[in-house]
């Protein structure tokens, strides 16, 4: 499995730990604030905000926290002003990495991201050095064990009718792909079946993958973990391909 879906699975497995540290709430608050600032505070008119509100509710974030974050984004309440930034990089084994951040200090964030990359066998790349290796797609992961008894045909028909352009069976999960502009409708179609996706967002999907094994694979996992633990990092995309055995070893 390639890096985008593999890392989504890893993050899901470590979700309970993240929640204890408040990391999920911190990230969601930033995303809510920025989404409201960019597209307004009405979720009916702001698909990006509507999706993040759904994520926040799924994470059991209190309703007042959600409202407060949105009000900060619209300027109704004072708060920290976050800026979006994206860094392109190479990881161990030459794997491409794209790091999305929300930060109140771009210079500080860039320096810290550079340090983490160099510490774990990677390096920052020039703009557009690796971005061309990815396509922007709506990407939804459904855990078969949590599909509420719905079979593959039922889910596939629902998402294709809603605008999905690809549906894949990945063993434990089903993966649904769509154009970014169709993502909201496809995600709603999944939820209308009573299914809560493991992961659902507009993502950068690699066109090709780089297979990593052994020490290099473990080093890549350590880099991903270090980046994910950074307070400003919101999302990481990569084109690595690592076996389930290597993944389990990294989680042990």
Where does each model-flagged region fall?
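Positively charged, low-complexity, intrinsically disordered RNA-binding extensions
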Residues: 143-252
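N-terminal cationic and glycine-rich segments that engage phosphates or anionic surfaces
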Residues: 1-141, 182, 211, 252
